[in-house]
């Protein structure tokens, strides 16, 4: 039903085939460590697009409510009295771990989950949570910083034999 779809890099492009034939597609994907569209520009695009289109879909991949700038975009639409509806999907942390048979929590093993980002870790120290054998760490955007991240975890008391899964 959408007149326009504003979509990100992480969205499966096959989803766009479900749109009506005259739908307008606007790509606003961000690529790590490359020049990309700034969030302020995306926010303005949300406002500008609604002037010419009655039904807009903001299609985001990953988990928008976890390091995905959901708050910034909601402030723009709600602050401009634009009606919206959020239709959540499966979180990337929950979906990817379940698909790979990795429980985030497990009786007697992991009683807590911490979500954090390692995106800035290449340039600065990121404070990691205190070591706990009963905690699962879900570290988003950590591929580039993986060697530094592992070293920091070991330096903070995690065993070098701690099980990790890298999902990209």
Give short role names for the model-derived ranges:
Residues 1-87, 95:
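Class I S-adenosyl-L-methionine
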Residues 41, 51-56, 69, 73-75, ...:
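A contiguous loop/helix-start segment that scaffolds small-molecule binding in enzyme catalytic cores
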Residues 12-15, 93, 123, 146-147:
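Short, well-ordered alpha-helical microsegments
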């Amino acid at each position: 039903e959408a007149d326009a779809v504003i979509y990100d890099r992480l969205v499966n492009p096959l989803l766009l085939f479900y749109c009506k034939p005259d739908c307008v597609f606007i790509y606003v994907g961000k690529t790590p460590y490359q020049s990309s569209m700034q969030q302020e520009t995306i926010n303005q695009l949300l406002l500008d697009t609604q002037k010419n289109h009655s039904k807009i879909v903001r299609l985001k991949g990953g988990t928008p409510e976890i390091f995905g700038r959901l708050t910034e975009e909601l402030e723009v639409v709600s602050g401009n009295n634009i009606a919206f509806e959020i239709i959540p999907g499966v979180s990337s942390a929950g979906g990817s771990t379940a698909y790979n048979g990795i429980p985030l929590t497990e009786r007697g093993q992991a009683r807590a989950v911490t979500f954090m980002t390692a995106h800035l870790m290449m340039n600065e120290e990121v404070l990691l949570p205190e070591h706990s054998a009963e905690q699962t760490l879900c570290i988003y955007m950590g591929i580039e910083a993986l060697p530094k991240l592992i070293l920091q975890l070991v330096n903070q008391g995690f065993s070098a034999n701690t099980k990790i899964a890298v999902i990209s």
